[in-house]
Amino acid sequence: WTRLHLNWLRKLELSKVQRETVEEYLATYEALTSKIAALDVRIEDIASEERYSEKVNKLKCIKGIKTHIALSFVCEIGDFNRFKSADKFSGFIGLVPGECSSGNTERMLGITKAGNRHLRRLVVEISNTYRRGAVGRKSVALRERQKDMPKDVVAYADKATNRCQRKYQRMMFKGKNSNQAVAAVARELCCFIWGMMTGNYSRTAQAEASVYRSELD
């Protein structure tokens, strides 16, 4: 609710009982809002600790990932290198397609949803943000999060954002429903999160630089 809407509620002409009820709801709303704000401050404090800050700041360079989501991934996973590949990590989250095999017949199913439910919910929440906005356009908030971050980190994050946005648009153009498109984007995003946390962004930048130099030679 906006402050304008809250003021409108307070100025409504109501009976005494209705006014008491509305005021009780508003008091509860204000109390919970204050509590959430205090928790957000505490989360920011924890995320700024040395053991978390580098990883959290890298993930925050990706569209849709703010502090509480980045910290959730860092704390839940710990060492991302325990997953040998992006596919293994996606499988842990529960975003790989299932398979039903019988004899010589193989049939691919929807995503398994067998994995970390909390992180899967978060990555789907992020993926829903890619339904909106033009490819390549950054919000003021995202630019601020990317400020002073290494260029290769920002470039990799932008690549992730653009790929995910294009994937959603492409699947919708092909006639897929929104849930299918978001699930596909979520899997793609998981791969980029794994890449960011395992240093793949650095290897990608080095490989691209090597190709560029060979073309000049």
What are these regions (language model features)?
Residues 1-3, 42-43, 102-105, 134-140, ...:
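Short coil/turn segments at secondary-structure boundaries
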Residues 166-217:
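Basic, amphipathic alpha-helical segments enriched in Lys/Arg and hydrophobic/aromatic residues
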Residues 1-58, 146-148:
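Glycine-rich, often acidic, oxyanion-interacting loops/wings at catalytic, nucleic-acid
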Residues 36-39, 78-82, 129-138, 190-205:
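Short helix-capping/linker segments at secondary-structure and domain boundaries
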Residues 22-29, 49-53, 63, 109-113, ...:
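Conserved phosphate/pyrophosphate-binding and hydrolysis machinery centered on Walker-type P-loop NTPases
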Residues 1-10, 81, 105, 158, ...:
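HhH-family (HhH-GPD) DNA N-glycosylase catalytic core used in base-excision repair
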Residues 57-61, 67, 73-174, 213-217:
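Phosphate-backbone recognition surface of nucleic-acid-processing proteins
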